[in-house]
Amino acid sequence: MSQSVSERTRIKSDRYESGVIPYAKMGYWDASYAVKTTDVLALFRITPQPGVDPVEAAAAVAGESSTATWTVVWTDLLTACDRYRAKAYRVDPVPNAADQYFAFIAYECDLFEEGSLANLTASIIGNVFGFKAVAALRLEDMRIPHSYLKTFQGPATGIVVERERLNKYGTPLLGATVKPKLGLSGKNYGRVVYEGLKGGLDFLKDDENINSQPFMRWRERFLNCMEGINRASAATGEVKGSYLNVTAATMEEVYKRSEYAKEVGSIIIMIDLVMGYTAIQSMALWARENDMLLHLHRAGNSTYARQKNHGINFRVICKWMRMSGVDHIHAGTVVGKLEGDPLMIKGFYHTLRLTTLDVNLPYGLFFEMSWASLRRCMPVASGGIHCGQMHQLIHYLGDDVVLQFGGGTIGHPDGIQAGATANRVALESMVLARNEGADYFNQEVGPQILRNAAKTCGPLQSALDLWKDISFNYTSTDTADFAATSTANV
């Protein structure tokens, strides 16, 4: 039965005379809420302060990340406040964690500016992470609706077009980071690029913190890198590249360096995650307009992505970066020196490479989501990997990935070119064995494939001898909540 005008007036009067009332009673909790296809959905892992009800904590997160403040305000009456309030609609206990809960929250899509990652994140992670009602808070996953995704450009090039440009199919791409990452002169830097590409790699790259320092200014680096690229391409007949890091103090300088990279013939440029979301989107637009690949180094991500109870899960960063429009992003190796539970890494790679995401709790994927024709993003595996792990890398990561062996190329005892050749032969022999039906991931079969290939490749034999006992066996900090897993270093 509908309420009379006087009854509705009394209810509103009671609400707005009450000063401070619980968030759950302010409209930010609705267990019967019917999720709309146009809603932005967020899953938070919440750790309420002692004595705070989980439902109230979830409602507080919904309120503080949408329209609420600490008290009732009359100006709510001047808005469609019932529509614009985020709705916490489900709270589940986290398995094997007595004080943690998964809170599902729905946001009206009109709360966010079209095509603006900065505006989306200003609400979702902007202020709420410092809220006293929760002891810790982590953004675990998001579902971005089709209608909102369509306002973002997605990767400027994508996996398919990148392979067409390189004319390379059915195999991972090979790369390496120049080492040492700081201190080389431009001439020696270019020599490293040439040796690595001549030996069989597809890409060399700058590291995250090489920009324009006194020992080597950016223009000097770009020129020497391009000399190495052009010589290696002419010698091998293959398309080659080196990720030229254009990260700088101002966007004016970033654009200046990017334009110069284009003028001297580079096919790819690189930026760092620490540039910020607006800068990343701006560079993705520039890369699309100028027909360049855009590589993103995830510098800084572990400051908020690694801890299990507070921060942002990296799968969310993967979604945001694919929306922003980068072509490459570092996404973990499983077997290297950096954080990488195998199931979590699978979830990151699915997020970057699939056109539709299904719910997969062991992989940390909580929502179905169509990518609305946004191009796929190429994951990059980098950090403590070597050719002796090739069977594991292909098994865990598949073909659509750039395998970057920095120390695993430049640390080769016979030199950089030999290190690159060892990686190329290891990769091609493993891909061939896989395509012929070999049980290559078997811990006896895979290494034997490499040993057989090394009989006719001295650089591979030297690499296997040097690194055969190297692994990084540490338990991952961020593991799946719905499956018992451990770091897969074997």
From Swiss-Prot:
What does the entry comment about cofactor binding? Answer: Binds 1 Mg(2+) ion per subunit.
- UniProt cross-references to Pfam families, sorted A to Z: RuBisCO_large, RuBisCO_large_N
| Keyword field | Calvin cycle, Carbon dioxide fixation, Chloroplast, Lyase, Magnesium, Metal-binding, Monooxygenase, Oxidoreductase, Photorespiration, Photosynthesis, Plastid
Q: What is its main location?
A: plastid
Presence of keyword Translocase: no
Localization: Plastid, Chloroplast
Misc remark = The basic functional RuBisCO is composed of a large chain homodimer in a 'head-to-tail' conformation. In form I RuBisCO this homodimer is arranged in a barrel-like tetramer with the small subunits forming a tetrameric 'cap' on each end of the 'barrel'.
Role noted for this protein: RuBisCO catalyzes two reactions: the carboxylation of D-ribulose 1,5-bisphosphate, the primary event in carbon dioxide fixation, as well as the oxidative fragmentation of the pentose substrate in the photorespiration process. Both reactions occur simultaneously and in competition at the same active site.
- Similarity annotation: Belongs to the RuBisCO large chain family. Type I subfamily.
This one is known as Ribulose bisphosphate carboxylase large chain
Species lineage: Eukaryota, Sar, Stramenopiles, Ochrophyta, Bacillariophyta
